[in-house]
Amino acid sequence: MQRSNPIKISDFNSDAYREAYSRINGLVVVGEGLADRHFRLLARSIPEDRDELERLAAMEGRHATDFVGCGRHLDIKPDVALARRLFAPLHQLFLDCDRAGDLTGCLVIQGLIVECFAVAAYRCYLPVADSY
């Protein structure tokens, strides 16, 4: 299996890069914040794993803060409004599952959908992460 090459961006200061990064940064910041809230709700639903889930929630919250800092380092403001609008249906679905006691639904949304998105989005940070 052939491995893909790392993303190559020659101009981190170009308008196109900054606009795209603003959107991705907003999605990652909001996504990490949602993960924090989701793990805290899961901690209520799974008391035997509460400590671990609260630890994961705190970690996600720190990630959100770190990604805000990464954007600030590049003088880019995250497009949080777009991210909130895009994540709203997924977050509402998580809340609906939580209210209905559908633990499996909550775990699928957080453990698969939100976390897989995060892993995919992190690839966009690789070219700038070392300098940050």
Task: Report each predicted region and the residues it spans.
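Non-heme di-metal
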Residues: M1-Y132
